């Protein structure tokens, strides 16, 4: 699995071509910069069929053809530095009217490309979804949530609501994403409780940006990013580790049951 964002940096070799062909989100006012994380960027316009094909061909050449068959499609809302929805224009209309469809068409970008390659049982991890996203192999997680018991409580409602919306494959960042010191007994308690809950979620996933942060590993690209503290099951003390091992074994024993649910839940096979 590799992580892909829908943002295109001004410095990208593809930026000018995508801009000229209308493959990027437009703005009615101000500079055409919609997000400034790690550079000045604009999202590709997932509502434009030609833009979807263009992005897939780039991903196919650089990842799929080299053996990557699962994608982590982050930033799927999409996220903006300034949420001025009236200012953004998509191929099919203004963001304020059609913006919620973006994550579904982001998922469709990769689903259609992978299906055309003959792949079956397609599933990709996304940070957001919309009605119908299950048609495009969307496995949704609840985003960059805080590491707190109140946040854990919110996941119960979020997961139920996602299921009621017909999107069965859902998960959370066990322990929350933002914060949490692996050596802090209070966080260790939260992590264990969240791990127990995560065992019975459709997908079990340990992920987070732990503290204290580590120094960057390099000066360019992703290596220039600050990394979080260790976040493996053995990172939270021996007592927590023993409990986590118990629940990992339980999850492993549930694989036949989970597989059965996979083939009986709404999926691309029966929601054409």
Where are these regions (language model features)?
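Conserved small/polar residues in nucleotide/adenosyl-binding loops
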Residues: 263-270
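Aromatic- and carboxylate-enriched substrate-binding clefts and catalytic-loop regions
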Residues: 1-242
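Catalytic cores of secreted or luminal carbohydrate-active enzymes
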Residues: 246-262
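A penicillin-recognizing enzyme superfamily signal
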Residues: 113, 254, 265
């Amino acid at each position: 699995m590799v992580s892909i964002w829908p943002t295109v940096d001004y410095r990208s070799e593809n930026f000018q071509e995508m801009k000229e062909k209308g493959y990027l989100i437009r703005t009615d006012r101000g500079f055409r910069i919609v997000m400034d994380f790690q550079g000045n960027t604009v999202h590709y316009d997932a509502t434009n069929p030609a833009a979807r094909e263009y992005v897939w061909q780039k991903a196919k050449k650089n990842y799929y053809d080299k053996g990557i068959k699962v994608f982590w499609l982050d930033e799927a809302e999409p996220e903006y530095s300034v949420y001025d929805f009236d200012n953004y224009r998509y191929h099919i209309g203004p963001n304020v009217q059609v913006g919620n469809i973006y994550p579904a068409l982001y998922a469709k970008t990769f689903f259609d490309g992978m299906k055309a390659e003959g792949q079956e049982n397609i599933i990709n991890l996304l940070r957001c979804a919309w009605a119908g996203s299950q048609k495009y192999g969307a496995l949704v997680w609840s985003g960059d949530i805080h590491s707190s018991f109140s946040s854990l409580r919110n996941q119960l409602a979020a997961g139920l609501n996602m299921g009621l919306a017909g999107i069965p494959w859902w998960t959370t960042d066990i322990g929350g994403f933002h914060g949490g010191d692996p050596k802090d007994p209070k966080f260790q308690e939260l992590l264990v409780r969240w791990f127990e809950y995560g065992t019975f979620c459709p997908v079990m996933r340990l992920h987070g940006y732990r503290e204290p942060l580590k120094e960057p590993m390099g000066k360019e690209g992703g290596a220039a990013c600050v990394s979080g503290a260790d976040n493996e099951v053995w990172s939270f003390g021996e007592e927590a580790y023993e409990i986590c091992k118990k629940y990992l074994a339980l999850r492993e024993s549930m694989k036949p049951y989970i597989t059965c649910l996979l083939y009986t839940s709404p999926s691309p096979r029966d929601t054409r």
